[in-house]
């Protein structure tokens, strides 16, 4: 179905500084985002275009053409001034791929077969559905340490658009999941999502990438303190940078992390077919280990490390499914790949809100899951600890050091993603809080998520030591 969003735009609108330079980025973003939200997540295309994309790239949508082909599972975004069109297409098991200077046939020629999750074995009593997190069943929850009515009221507020008026965007909250003492005690969905909807984590994907590095280290396939296995760095000033330094965002190889227009990170995500090559080609600016600089490219360098160790797109996919996802009963999660069959480890992870909570619970349980040590205690202790370069960042996740962001909770750790994605771990209260959505206004994100955390905390008492 082809829709002409608009046929004209005045010269005044096009005269903004740098606006024309942003058109290719905007088209790539829109094609990729619309493809992922329609075909990965099942959202309505008009909802995605009008409520999620337009706020991100306005006023550019007024000159664009958008074609969503449900039969081919493909999205094409063009403009009325040029013949250049951005195309993204869906593949079962690995989501949407943005085509830039490659064809769909090129991408589909890279060997890939999606796997099926393992069969659920019945319990001794014949039951086939275990209680969450080891299955999907849930029960009514009451606990003396929690005022459930107060907790529900606090969590419901982040779905209420009228509670946060005066900001530059809507909340667009898609999910909230709350876990207490390993039990799922609250979940609510919005924007057409439900408990089965794979939801984009954006930079929460970095935490998954960190876990995969930890798994490789646990299995003796990777040494964190040796030079990162990136052949492009041999015989250069970057050759001594270690995987541990990359995990801590302290490799010293920098890119501009700005999502508001044309920048290094938007070029990598929306104008480069080979994202790993772009990420590893950037120059060294600081001495490795000394300087913290948050970067999606750093996580993509880690994804390149994973790919170099394992060898292929299929091997990477099989590894994260079989070694991390399936053991946690994450049955339908995936991370998207670029047009060269390389995992986009900094931004493109999809899973249900319940599954994002499972990842948080894995770290809160020190890597233990249903009697199995999925990640070593040594790895978890390292990942959750401040680095030498930054006291508020560990191995691909954030740390509320000294209660800087949330007072009185120095043990709080969190995964964080663009547009307000969060998985929050609060060990002192035995809580996991997940929030997903499409909130463009940064100040609105911070206010609403802080209100959610404070409200949930007010409804709970500390866990027993």
Regions found by a protein language model. Give the residues of each.
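Active-site Gly/Thr loop motif
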Residues: 330-337, 381-432
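Short, charged, amphipathic alpha-helices and their helix-cap/turn boundaries
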Residues: 154-157, 183-188, 263-288, 313-333
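Active-site-proximal alpha-helical segments within enzyme catalytic domains
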Residues: 210, 297-307, 347-369, 421-437
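Beta-lactamase-like hydrolase cores
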Residues: 137-177
